[in-house]
Amino acid sequence: FPSIPKDHKAREYISTNMIANFFGLGWAATPAGIKAMEELEKLEDERRKSPVLGKRGVPKGIANTEMCTFLIVNISSLQLIPINIIAYRTQYGSTNPTRIVGAAILATTVSTVVGVIFAWVMERVKKV
């Protein structure tokens, strides 16, 4: 998220959300994701008010590029340890509940990479 200032609070919430998702803790990622979106909206409000950045801002009620990219990354949810799937497999008697980890890492990596590329392409198309 290069267009978010280095010291902006949104970066902290985005990082917390991504780390929680990375470890398969979706329930812990949700509050950080909500706060990140709120902070991104505040950032967009600041851009709208700025005489220099005002042209960059999007109309109120429309998600900006950072919001869309964050949602894509959040939804694709790159995971190292799919805790919920392991728990379900254990609950239903799997003899090797962690066998899914490799496939889960591959699937979430591919979905995250494709999502980020999609967001990047859409940003470029929007600028044309």
Name the predicted role of every residue range:
Residues 18, 23-27, 74-79, 108, ...:
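Mid-bilayer segments of alpha-helical transmembrane spans in multi-pass integral membrane proteins
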Residues 41, 93, 122-126:
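Signal for well-folded cores of large energy- and translation-related assemblies
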Residues 80-93:
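Transmembrane alpha-helical segments of integral membrane proteins
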Residues 10-20, 63-73, 96-102:
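The feature identifies polytopic integral membrane transport proteins across all domains of life
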Residues 99-128:
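Juxtamembrane and boundary regions of transmembrane helices in multi-pass small-molecule transporters
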Residues 25-71, 90-92:
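Hydrophobic transmembrane alpha-helices that form the pore/transport pathway of multi-pass ion
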